[in-house]
Amino acid sequence: ICVLGVDNKRIGAIMITKLARGRTKEVKYMAVGTYEITHEKILESGREQFLKNGYERTNLRELCKGAGITTGAYYRHFEDKAALFSALVEPAVNGLRERYDAAGERCFDYISVDNMTDLWNVSVETMVEFIEFIFSHFDSFKLLLHCADGTKYVDFTDWMVEKEVQDTLKMYDVLEEKGIKYKRLGLKELHMLNHAYYSCIFETVLHDYTKEEAIQTTHTLAEFITAGWRKVHGL
């Protein structure tokens, strides 16, 4: 009886241990699930508040209220309001930059083999690709272009323009190395023309075009920009 009692205690202890471990795992899984759910609610509320009020006018208390949490709980997820804004727009920023860099590499490849015809085709393809990507992240670009005052992203368009200007200067170097005649534009001219280019693309977001309208307009814009670009460069 004594031995059986010991065995029963051991069995009971083992069962309790297993049960405790199971509950610990269950609590852990629940905690992870709750964290992820809360995180998503914060992102959703942040997106809604930023789109409605802009970054500067968005009140963190109202944002937390929309997510159903306290401000204390908010800081378990984000360091500050700026960190939340970054989380909402950074994937879109990085994605557009990656597509820009890939298109730039294709352009330089064509120039290096004197294939100017395909160079202009890349410009058209790139514009359409940009629109496709922008409309798959529409709210993020709306935040970038319309709601970013007070954030480090307020100069996003100028960053794209400056990148385009620098790559155009690199293109000039390659054209000269290849002995291809062209007309060189000044920095202010390049900035103005490239700013007009991106302003036209981003108009589709600022004025809430449908994706179909944006793509149709982009084809017209691509023909217009490409013809003008070739004309002013004498290519």
What residues fall within each predicted segment?
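Basic, helix-initiating cap at the start of DNA-binding domains
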Residues: V6-N53, R57-G66, E79, A83
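Short hydrophobic/aromatic patch on the recognition helix
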Residues: G68-F78
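Amphipathic alpha-helical packing segments from all-alpha helical-bundle domains
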Residues: E129-S136, G150-E177, K188-H195
